[in-house]
């Protein structure tokens, strides 16, 4: 794409080294300005990030849902369906089974139904246990991923500053093999050389 822009803009500039640097800087500016006009998508990461944020802002929020939690495990799906049936048919429903209890999610076409369900069943006793009912706003998948990445990056930055962090530079260690080589490479003392010479002469 840079080559195509160079052909459009032209290369009629001075030959001096200082002017050549300025010329390339101006050509880069012109490429950035002409790119959107000629239909070329921006290639830099900053522009892509801005486009992604713009799309996220333009996307409408997901409809609110009702969440019923702390449901005893012995409560059947039929019982839960009967509880919700009086408020109409949900357009979305999902039940999660945990180790200690159950959780169900419902979405209705009429958002006013959610408030009625909260008033009716929040704190309601079901099989000797009080259930919790709340309205929540679901997030889109990419929004959750971005939030997770931000938390992960923050944790990594804090970890680099903490004493004892694995990012801290470790002292250089010499292996046993290298230590043995270092010992063998040490020069022999004068006394040892004299002793070897005497032994050679006597023998």
Curated annotation (Swiss-Prot):
GO terms for molecular function: DNA binding; RNA binding. Residues 139-153, 165-180 have a biased composition (Basic residues). Keywords: Acetylation, DNA-binding, mRNA transport, Nucleus, RNA-binding, Transport. Residues 47-60, 154-164 have a biased composition (Basic and acidic residues). Residues 1-60, 137-203 are annotated as: Disordered. It holds the Pfam family RRM_1. The modification N-acetylmethionine is found at residue 1. Residues 11-20 have a biased composition (Polar residues). This is RNA annealing protein YRA2. It comes from Saccharomyces cerevisiae (strain YJM789). The lineage of its organism: Eukaryota, Fungi, Dikarya, Ascomycota, Saccharomycotina.
């Amino acid at each position: 794409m840079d080559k195509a822009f160079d052909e459009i803009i032209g290369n009629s500039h001075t030959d001096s080294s200082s002017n050549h640097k300025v010329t390339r800087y101006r050509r880069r500016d012109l490429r950035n300005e002409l790119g959107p006009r000629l239909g070329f998508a921006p290639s830099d990461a900053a522009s892509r990030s801005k486009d992604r944020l713009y799309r996220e802002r333009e996307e409408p929020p997901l409809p609110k849902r009702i969440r019923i939690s702390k449901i005893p495990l012995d409560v059947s799906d039929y019982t839960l369906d009967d509880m919700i049936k009086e408020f109409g048919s949900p357009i979305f429903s999902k039940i999660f089974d945990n180790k200690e209890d159950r959780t169900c999610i419902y979405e209705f076409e009429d958002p006013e139904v959610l408030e009625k369900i909260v008033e009716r069943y929040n704190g309601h006793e079901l099989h000797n246990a009080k259930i919790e009912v709340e309205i929540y706003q679901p997030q889109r998948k990419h929004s959750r991923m971005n939030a997770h990445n931000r938390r992960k990056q923050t944790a990594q930055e804090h970890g680099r500053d903490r004493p004892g962090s694995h990012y801290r530079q470790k002292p250089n260690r010499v292996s046993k093999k290298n230590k043995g080589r270092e010992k063998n490479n040490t020069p022999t003392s004068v006394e040892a050389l004299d002793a070897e010479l005497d032994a050679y002469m006597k023998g």
